[in-house]
Amino acid sequence: MKRIILTYTLAFSLLSAYAGEGGSPPLKNTDKSLLIDYVDPFIGTTNFGTTNPGAICPNGMMSVVPFNVMGSSENTYDKDARWWSTPYEYTNCFFTGYAHVNLSGVGCPELGSLLLMPTTGELNVDYKEYGSKYKDEQASPGYYSNYLTKYNVKTEVSATPRSGI
């Protein structure tokens, strides 16, 4: 009985070794795209999806996100109490600043955000006055930018695990 088990074990070992050695050559990756190229930060940023396309570092302490849900008659959710659940709504185009500690996709209010707004000219603290329409919005993992038409300024933010700039 031991001889039969030993014979089968030896045969199986030889076949396994041969199967690993031979066969077709290893496949080469001819596609030069990276997995990061398939990420769309704008998924879930409308219809109260509560996500944002900001500069966010995975598992990091910092998330620099655009705030655009208040301040303009063109914003569809400005007078709706539900806008408190998210700092960003894709269909709105009135930018009021960057928040640095918002979470994405939590589905509940995140109040008390300190907004930073790049502006030029006289200081104005009324968000309906200092806010600006924007265009040329771009986002990728860890990066967000837009162009503020009122101030003729391109804004860019990025995040690392412990800081955002």
Language model region names:
Residues 16-28:
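Bacterial Sec-dependent signal peptides at the C-terminal "C-region" and cleavage site
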Residues 7-16:
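Bacterial N-terminal signal peptides
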Residues 25-165:
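Accessory carbohydrate-recognition regions in carbohydrate-active enzymes
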Residues 1-4:
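Positively charged n-region of N-terminal signal peptides that target proteins for export
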Residues 6-7, 86:
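General helical structural elements
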